[in-house]
């Protein structure tokens, strides 16, 4: 979705709202170079966990061990949330100071964008684990269909949030969260 977000965001804010290219680039930079970088770290842990769970899920699925599958799913979700929730909460609450420390950016806008970190980290961690579980039980087409549907919904929501509600860069952040929720 990020591949499409930048041109959609850029065309709408510069074309419709007459925002300068410099301002647009600054706002997109906050989103892509700070917000996305910091939220991707805990999501990467969930991604590595999901990679590790697939072989065990396949083994339980082939053996028709329902209890084993349920235990593995439960453990993966618990461990993922054990990492995602505190990381997301920390980024959400301490986003301003973290950005000041790492990037020298103490702006209020950056701190406000970081408030959304909790939701982003949790929903993307859950969707990553869920997709791995579906792959482990031989339901490969479901994540693909869900991603396609989520992308369409994401683009519609992003456009509405930008054009109707004029949420600027926050529309991209909220659109990103809705993508993770619907996957």
Which residue stretches match the model-derived regions?
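Interfacial segments at transmembrane-helix termini and the short loops linking adjacent helices
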Residues: 74, 92-122
């Amino acid at each position: 979705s990020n591949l499409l977000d930048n041109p959609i965001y850029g065309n709408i804010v510069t074309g419709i709202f007459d925002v300068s290219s410099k301002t647009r680039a600054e706002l997109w930079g906050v989103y892509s170079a700070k917000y996305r970088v910091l939220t991707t770290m805990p999501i990467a842990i969930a991604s590595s966990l999901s990679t590790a769970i697939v072989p065990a899920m396949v083994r339980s699925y082939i053996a028709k061990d329902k209890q084993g599958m349920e235990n593995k799913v439960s453990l993966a979700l618990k461990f993922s949330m054990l990492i995602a929730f505190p990381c997301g909460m920390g980024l959400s609450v301490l986003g301003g100071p973290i950005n000041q420390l790492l990037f020298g950016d103490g702006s209020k806008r950056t701190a406000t964008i970081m408030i959304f970190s909790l939701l982003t980290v949790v929903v993307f961690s859950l969707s990553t684990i869920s997709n791995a579980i579906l792959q482990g039980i031989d339901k490969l087409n479901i994540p693909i269909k869900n991603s396609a549907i989520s992308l369409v919904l994401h683009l519609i929501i992003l456009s509405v949030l930008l054009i109707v509600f004029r949420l600027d860069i926050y529309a991209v952040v909220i659109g990103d969260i809705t993508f993770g929720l619907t996957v």
